[in-house]
């Protein structure tokens, strides 16, 4: 059993006690339906209500963790059904942090990831209600490469109008590039960063 409070009560999520059969870190809500989808990717959301809203709108390849952060167990489970996951967390600070935490976990499991930008809306339900399923599909298609998403977030952490801030930003980019073990992949991202920021700073 898994439940979510509809108001502001606590705890936000309430699940049955964990057993050998029910392990939150190795189960995904909606996977029983999503795994049969013909889409080439699965969409990872924050919670039950996101999945329900998306399935109602026709996006049946959406899943969510059971009120917990993404784990290596979740990533391994996703790997069994897809090579690519779209991270679709809320557009607030907590959602951004969750995406940043999830990217390396998925990468370690051998799953490619992209990040969907829902702004100016907070979550999938709000976006779909205001913009419709077609516009939502377009946002999915525009999902950012996960590495370049990290680069964009890093850019916002430094005073880019100052040379020192620019220097610290590019040092951060270099650190992230060194995390990439594959030389070809690293060179491709170097080119992508140069292309994006050439002439800006």
Task: List where the protein language model places each region.
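Short, hinge-like loop/turn segments at secondary-structure boundaries
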Residues: 81-82, 103-105, 130-137
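Glycine-rich phosphate-binding loops that contact phosphosugars or nucleotide phosphates
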Residues: 74, 93-97, 101-108
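Phosphate-handling DNA/RNA-contact segment within nucleic-acid enzymes
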Residues: 1-81, 85, 98-99
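C-terminal or mid-to-C-terminal helical accessory/interaction module adjacent to the motor/catalytic core
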Residues: 111-200
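Alpha-helical scaffold segments in soluble metabolic enzymes
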Residues: 33, 53, 77, 101, ...
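Acidic, metal-coordinating catalytic cores used for nucleic-acid/nucleotide bond scission
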Residues: 49, 70, 89-99, 117, ...
């Amino acid at each position: 059993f898994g439940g979510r409070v509809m108001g502001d009560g606590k705890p936000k999520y309430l699940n049955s006690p964990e057993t050998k059969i029910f392990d939150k870190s190795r189960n995904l809500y909606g996977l029983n339906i999503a795994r049969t989808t013909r889409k080439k990717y699965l969409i990872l959301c924050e919670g039950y209500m996101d999945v329900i809203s998306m399935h109602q709108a026709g996006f049946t390849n959406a899943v969510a963790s059971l009120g917990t952060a993404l784990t290596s167990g979740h990533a391994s489970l996703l790997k069994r059904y897809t090579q690519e996951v779209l991270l679709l967390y809320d557009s607030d600070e907590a959602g951004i942090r969750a995406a940043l935490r999830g990217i390396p976990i998925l990468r370690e499991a051998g799953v490619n990831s992209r990040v969907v930008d829902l702004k100016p809306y907070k979550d999938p339900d709000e976006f779909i209600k205001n913009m419709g399923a077609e516009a939502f599909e377009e946002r999915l298609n525009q999902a950012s490469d996960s590495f370049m998403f990290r680069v964009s977030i890093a850019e916002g952490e430094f005073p880019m109008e100052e040379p020192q801030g620019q220097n610290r930003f590019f040092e951060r980019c270099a650190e992230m590039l060194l995390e990439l073990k594959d030389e070809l992949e690293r060179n491709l991202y170097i080119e992508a960063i140069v292309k994006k920021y050439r002439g800006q700073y």
